[in-house]
Amino acid sequence: NNVALISPRRIGKTDLLHQCFRQPEIKEKYHTFVIDIYATSSVRDFVNVFGKAVLDELRPKGKSVWEGFLNVLSSLRSEISFDINGQPTWGIGLGAITNPIATLDEIFHYLNHADKPCLIAIDEFQQITKYGDDANIEAALRTYIQRCHNSHFVFSGSHRHLMGAIFTS
């Protein structure tokens, strides 16, 4: 079952989601992801934020957990950076996403085959209506979500009319 959570901005939807996902009984049984897409303006941005949120959430759970995600993504890159003291640090992140829909397909493939069920909250979900680069993103996401039997979604938004239009069309 999926849920839409709609209220004005700055009311506490995001804090509520984080609080729910921090509950021990949720953390034990599910992989949880909160994806804030407010600052996204394209499908590519959305896919980048989505993939990064999944990777960042899985990384502390151990190598075997996040390796499962890394193995399905083709748009990965290794990165070397330097901390404030000049010490090099190595990491893995999302690289250039040349085909956002293919990468989205890979992310949903992982979610559907993860070792535990997944709870995914997409915050400011109405933002997808503003993506000019792919008018079909709503239909694509609807299809992915309907076929993703290992995950449940919370669609959080602050614009009632846009959220209503998404879920009634």
Locate predicted features.
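Catalytic NTP-binding/metal-coordinating core of nucleotidyl cyclase/transferase enzymes
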Residues: 163
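Short, aromatic/basic amphipathic alpha-helical patches
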Residues: 21, 167-169
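Conserved Walker B catalytic segment
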Residues: 2, 90-160, 168
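P-loop NTPase nucleotide-binding core
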Residues: 2-3, 7-11, 15-119
